[in-house]
Amino acid sequence: PDLPEIRETLLPPMRIAKPVGWGDSVPQAPQGFTVTALATGLNIPRQMLVLPNGDVLVAEGRGGGAPRLRPKDVIAGFIKKQGNTKVESGNRLTLLRDANGDGVADVRTVFLDSLNAPYGLAFVDGYIYIAEQDALVRVPYVEGQTQASAEPEEVTKLPSALNHHWTKALTASADGSTLYVGIGSNSNVGERGMAVEEERAVVWAIDRETGARRTLARGIRN
C-alpha cells in the first residue's frame, strides 16, 4: 500500500472517538443466540470470575498514575483523556447472582470494597485471590456468601512505581499451588529509561501459601 510521508507535528492530527455506552443497543449474536445484559451501571468493569455456585464476581477499577515529567507527557495525557470514560473507578468487587436463570442478575452486592485498582481474579481452595495494582491479596470464601467476611490478606507486593501499564492479570496453575501474575512494562518503547523497568514486563510465578516468587518470563510488554 502507499503510505504517507513522515510528518512531524506538535499535536498529532488525529480524532479521538468519544466514549459512549451501549444505550439500548446490544451486540449482534449469531443466529440462535441472544445477548442479555447481566448487569448495567458498573464502575469500569475489568475482569470476571465465575464462582463454584455460578455467582459472578466483577472487578471494577482504574489504576495507573504515571507522572507527567516532560512536555510530551502533558500533551499525550490531554489527548488520551479525550478517550477516557468519565465514570469514577469502583475499586471494588461486585457479586452478581442470576437466581432464576433469565440472564439478568437478581442479586447484586458489593462483595469487597476499598481495593486499589483490582484486575485479575482467581479462586483456589477456599480463597478468592485479587491482583490489585500494587499487591496480590486474598479473602476467604464460602459458597453462597454475598459479601467478604474478612479483610484482604496480602500474599505479596507487586511492582507499582509509576505504573504506566498498571493492570495485573492473574491465573492459577492446574494444581492451584502457583499463581501467575502478569506485570506490564512502565513504558511503550523504553522512553522513561531502563531503571523504571526493573521487574516490569514480566510474569511472576508466586507460591500461593508463602508468597515466594520467581520470574517465569520476561520481555512481555503488558
Predicted regions and their residues:
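Beta-propeller domains with acidic blade repeats across secreted/periplasmic ectodomains
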Residues: P1-N222
